[in-house]
Structures are given as C-alpha cells and as structure tokens.
Amino acid sequence: MNKRELGNSGEEKAVEFLKKMGYEILHRNFRCKLGEVDIIAKEGNTIVFVEVKTRRSLKFGYPSEAITMTKQRHLKRVAEYFVQRQKAKNCMYRFDVVEVYMNVKNEVLDINLIKNAF
C-alpha cells in the first residue's frame, strides 16, 4: 500500500469515526483554488474543517506534528473561502485533526481526535 492509499484508507476510517461521534459530513476532499481540506463536517452549529493524518508508526513523530504552520495557513484560507462561498460569514468554525494509527494489515490500531487543534 502506497502513501496515497494509506491516506485514503485513513480518511475512510476518520469519516466512520466522526459519524459515530455525531459529526455530519458535508464534504470530503474539498478543493478550491486556495487548496484542499480532507473533511468538512458539522458538529452542532459549528463547521469543522478536519485534517486527517494516518501513520503506521511514530518513526517520524506524531501524525499531527506533520501539520506545519504553512499547512495551517492554507487550511485557514480554504476555510475562509468555504465560509464566504456558503454565505455563512457569522458562523462558528474550527479546525480539528484526526490521527489514525494503522498496522500493516490496514487495521486501525487507534484513532485520536484533536478538537480545536489550531
């Protein structure tokens, strides 16, 4: 399984997890001229922009550590674009991170949700 397949599998598991946590999934892999966000969901009245990071080991650190300041800025721009496009300027929104840990058999070992990650 290559990195893209691992990432896609992790996103599938993250969507299942978020649904169980009561999130309503609005979009997956939302793309615009400013960038891309893995999942856009809604929890209550809050729009949640979710970045999913999937790992097989901690060899390169925790998954959330891979979300650099540059990536955070890109995600914030995409979020602002999305909110403006939806004409929901006064809505509340936040950024969550879902860390998915999988083994070589593509089985989930653990899923960690970080609300208000940045």
Swiss-Prot record:
SUPFAM superfamilies xref list: Restriction endonuclease-like
Give an example GO molecular function: nucleic acid binding
Q: Sorted alphabetically, which InterPro entries does this protein's record hold? A: Restrct_endonuc-II-like (IPR011335), tRNA_endonuc-like_dom_sf (IPR011856), UPF0102_YraN-like (IPR003509)
Q: Which family does it belong to?
A: Belongs to the UPF0102 family.
HAMAP family attached to this UniProt entry: UPF0102
What is the name attached to this protein's record?
UPF0102 protein Csac_2148
